[in-house]
């Protein structure tokens, strides 16, 4: 989740939900190197470039990518170039596209608009240490406890962790 404590974070230009869905689509089976994605950013002299940006796309810094690759060596990455045209500056981030896991418990509760009210995950259904939830319209990234502890030991910026309920 986004860390609201990071003030003046860099903000990529807005994207439509359709664009986001297409970019996040699973690239497996395409056997081709994807071209970098260029996103314009809005900055000020106080702008901060955190290690994790959640919106409009889940983006990670080089440093965070290196750590996540240790837990998921087969994960495919796509370079995203954040471009500030006013200051003629570019920064490289990486699009995080973890696999979708079918791990929702029957105990999960939903609001009428299909957003999560109470999230409960099935204990044995988690294969990947970093994943998204199949069947959820919310864009959050989920991680195993070992990954969370590793991230916290290295003082990454821009992330906020929240415990998720597991099925008993």
Which residues fall in each region the model found?
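Phosphate/anion-contacting hairpin/loop surfaces
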Residues: 1-168
